[in-house]
Amino acid sequence: MAKLPVEKMRELERRFGEIEARMSAGPSADVYVKLASEYSELQPVVSKIRAYEKATAELADIAAMLADRATDKDMRDLAEMEKPEVEEKIEALEQEIQILLLPKDAADEKSAILEIRAGTGGSEAALFAGDLFRMYERYAASKGWRVEVLSASEGEAGGYKEIIATVSGRGVFSRLKFESGVHRVQRVPETEASGRIHTSAATVAVLPEAEEIDIDVRPEDIRVDTMRSSGAGGQHVNTTDSAVRITHIPTGIVVTSSEKSQHQNRAKAMQVLRSRLYDMERQRADSERSADRRSQVGSGDRSERIRTYNFPQGRLTDHRINLTLYKLDRMMEGEIDDVVDALLADYQASQLALLGERQN
């Protein structure tokens, strides 16, 4: 295990105490808001540091008691009994502190752009893409996040050939970022008379939602085309050219949005374009650090098959961490915290292992 950065811990405690004192002194509203934000950010790690310091002091007292020949038998027995419990507590706190001190992904607190596309499997793939979107919608609702569809192309038998949505809320990207990749489904389609199991797939991409401050899109780098919005069966929704297609000339990225308002369409298309460019920049930076990777979870390879949903067995398997759960019905209703937490824990463990290697 990596060593705890004692100096950094002391500095965090010192800063936390300074913030507490300044908040108690009655600063202006603007200053108070900034202090409160930093306070809430530091509070989890400082509370663990204080618990760790208390436990290490307790262990030192136990060691002194056991080393003192004047300690009577009852007290010695009690100290011997408490020692392993305190040592176990210290070990757990060390790991929690190390995780809290891991470098933060700058995008973790952002909202996200969720893109789901039907892959191999025809109509069944589109239906599965629809099921995945519903799963994420339910999950978002359970977290108090807001989902807004930016564009959707429906499948002939239902579901979606493609659907793009924003998922807005604090920390959305940190919870959904490991969902990117190929999701495979094994089930008997409703139209299958013989009861044969079919395999199909959908691709999920989760991008951190970029703001104008994150990525600068120059006007001369984009081409904006307008066209008529189409409804079901290709019927024109209105007589105006409201749909918008934006092409980013340097990269060739094309984004479309086809709601009724041209102004809204341009804003939504720019929102997706910025996020894709921001994601490209993040992936470029990640690939430069790829030699440091210790976990499949964080690879972000969207062509990688990451998960299988086997409906006949009620089984979900995440292939990156060899996790299998037999509660597929509940997970399709949005109860995916178990797999999200396991993926996050695996990623954190890999980062801790890397930190330990660098210190050796």
UniProtKB/Swiss-Prot annotation:
Record GO terms (molecular function): translation release factor activity, codon specific
Listed InterPro entries: PCRF, Pep_chain_release_fac_I, Pep_chain_release_fac_I_sf, Prokaryotic/Mito_RF, RF-1
Keyword line: Cytoplasm, Methylation, Protein biosynthesis
Keyword presence, Transport: no
Compartments, as annotated in UniProt: Cytoplasm
Domain of life from the UniProt record: Bacteria
Residues where N5-methylglutamine is found: 235
Region (Disordered): 281-311
Biased composition (Basic and acidic residues): 281-307
Record carries keyword Cytoplasm: yes
Main location as per UniProt: cytoplasm
Gene Ontology cellular-component terms listed: cytoplasm
Post-translational modifications: Methylated by PrmC. Methylation increases the termination efficiency of RF1.
Family: Belongs to the prokaryotic/mitochondrial release factor family.
Function recorded in the entry: Peptide chain release factor 1 directs the termination of translation in response to the peptide chain termination codons UAG and UAA.
PANTHER family: LD18447P
Protein name: Peptide chain release factor 1
Organism name: Rhizobium meliloti (strain 1021) (Ensifer meliloti)
